[in-house]
Amino acid sequence: MDVFLMIRRHKTTIFTDAKESSTVFELKRIVEGILKRPPEEQRLYKDDQLLDDGKTLGECGFTSQTARPQAPATVGLAFRADDTFEALRIEPFSSPPELPDVMKPQDSGGSANEQAVQ
């Protein structure tokens, strides 16, 4: 089954999908194709816990029930900087601006679906 993932590092977010049977190392290969950093310079995390390269995504807890298209699971990403890995850091998403008045629902006293019957 497919799992849907949101790989996050600082302000970078990658949306991807993979098979539950894919390994963590294979997921690092996907990241390498996008961010041009080899797997040995990457660490992937689930809830601040380092993921083992040899385990499958399913063994790490990513299943089609927990990582759905409409609610992808979050995977943290850290890169090697010189001889050590950076600390895992994920910036929170920004808040959307307030809706303009013209887009806010209008309370006209009746349902928008009601029509006058003649």
Swiss-Prot record:
Pfam families: ubiquitin
Localization terms from the record: Nucleus
Entry GO terms, CC: Cul2-RING ubiquitin ligase complex; Cul5-RING ubiquitin ligase complex; cytosol; elongin complex; VCB complex
GO biological process: protein ubiquitination; target-directed miRNA degradation; transcription elongation by RNA polymerase II; transcription initiation at RNA polymerase II promoter
Keywords: Acetylation, Nucleus, Phosphoprotein, Transcription, Transcription regulation, Ubl conjugation pathway
Residue(s) carrying N-acetylmethionine: M1
Domain Ubiquitin-like stretches: 1-79
PTM-bearing positions, type Phosphoserine: S108, S111
Phosphoprotein recorded as keyword: yes
Family: Belongs to the Elongin B family.
This protein's name: Elongin-B
Source species taxonomy: Eukaryota, Metazoa, Chordata, Craniata, Vertebrata
